[in-house]
Amino acid sequence: MVNRISILGSTGSIGVQTLDVARNLNIKVDGLAANKNIDLLEKQAREFQPKIVAVKDEERARILRDRLSDTDCKVVGGVEGLKMVASIETVETVVTSIVGIAGLIPTMEAIKHKKNIALANKETLVTAGHIVMSEAARMGVKILPVDSEHSAVFQSLMGNNKKDVAKIILTASGGPFRGRKKEELRNVTLREALNHPNWSMGSKITIDSATMMNKGLEVIEAHWLFEIPQDDIEVLVHPQSIIHSMVEYKDGSIIAQLGSPDMRLPIQFALTYPDRKQNNFSKLDIVKIGSLTFEAPDLEAFPCLGLAFEALRAGGTMPAVLNAANEKAVGLFLQEKIRFLDIPEIIEKVMGRHSVKPDPDIDDIIDVDLWARKIVEEIVK
C-alpha cells in the first residue's frame, strides 16, 4: 500500500473519490492539481495540507495563492505547475485523473521521476501508449489501472500466465441510450445524454459513455496496458455494470471481477495493490440483483466504438486524431452547438483527412492533436 500520493485532477469526479479513499486509508496527499475549480481546490488544500497545489489556469493560480497565503501550501500555475505536482520527491504514486490529452505531459513527468502511476486518464495511453508503456518499463514504473474495466482485467490476470490468455472481454453498460436505433438518437438532448443509468462521472466521460466512444478508448487503452492484440479484445454490453470485465483463457475458462458500480473500489485497489483493505463502501448483494445479462453492441447506432477499432488498426497518430476530434466534438455537444449524431460523423470525417505517421513522438502527437481540433472547427463552421 502507498503512503504518499499526488492527484492530478483532484477536483474532478475521480479526484474527489480518490480523496475519499485517501481519507479512509489515512494516505498522505502531498500534491493536488486542478484545471480551474479553485473553490473546491482551496477546500481540499485546507483539509489535506499538501506541499504543492497547482492550477493549470495561471490567473486562477494567482487568486488561489492569495487565498492560501495563511497555509504552508506552495501554489503554482500552468503546465509547469502540473509537472511539479507530478514529481514531488516524497510521493510514491501519482493518480492521473486529468480529463483528456492534457494528462499526457504531467504523466510522462511522473514516470521520468520514477513515480508509480494510478491511471485514470485513458487518453494518455490512447494517444501515446507506445511511448508511455516503453518509458514506464525503462524506468521500472508500475502503471496501475483505475478505470473499473481495466482494474477488473488486471485483477482477472493476477496469478495467471499472460501467454494463456485467449481474449479480454470489456463490459459496457450501454449508456442511457442502450437499445435505441440510430434513427431514435437523431434528436436526443444533452440532458438525456448526461443521464447515465449506473455511474456518477464527469460530463465528458458521461457523453463518451452515451456514444460508446468511452468503450472504444478503453479498447485502445487495454491494447497497450495488457499487450493484447486488438483482435483479442471483445466488447459486450452488460446493463447491470456488476461484472466490470473478464479474461477468457485458452482452456475456455473465464475469470471475471464483480463489484458494485462504485469507482472508489478500483481507485482503492490501485492504491493498496497488492493488498486489499477494509472499507465502508456498500457491498454487492448478488441475490438482490437477481440476474446478469449480456448483449452485443450495436455498431450501427453507436459507430464511435467501430471508429476506435479502426483507429487502433491504423496505428501511429490515428488514435490521437480520434481522441482529439472526439474531445472537440463532445465539447461542442456539451455547449449544444452540434447534435448527438454529429459526434461520430465529425470524428469519421477528421480521420478520413488524416495521413498516419507510423511511429510518432510526443511532439508529433501534440501536433496532430491541434490539427484534428482545427479540422473539427472547420467542419462545424
Curated annotation (Swiss-Prot):
Its cofactor is Mg(2+); Mn(2+). NADPH binds at residues 11-14, 36-37, 121, 123, 202. It catalyses: 2-C-methyl-D-erythritol 4-phosphate + NADP(+) = 1-deoxy-D-xylulose 5-phosphate + NADPH + H(+). GO terms for molecular function: 1-deoxy-D-xylulose-5-phosphate reductoisomerase activity; manganese ion binding; NADPH binding. GO terms for biological process: isopentenyl diphosphate biosynthetic process, methylerythritol 4-phosphate pathway involved in terpenoid biosynthetic process. It is an enzyme of class 1 (oxidoreductase). Its EC number is 1.1.1.267. Mn(2+) binds at residues 147, 149, 218. Catalyzes the NADPH-dependent rearrangement and reduction of 1-deoxy-D-xylulose-5-phosphate (DXP) to 2-C-methyl-D-erythritol 4-phosphate (MEP). Belongs to the DXR family. This is 1-deoxy-D-xylulose 5-phosphate reductoisomerase. It comes from Acetivibrio thermocellus (strain ATCC 27405 / DSM 1237 / JCM 9322 / NBRC 103400 / NCIMB 10682 / NRRL B-4536 / VPI 7372) (Clostridium thermocellum). The lineage of its organism: Bacteria, Bacillati, Bacillota, Clostridia, Eubacteriales.
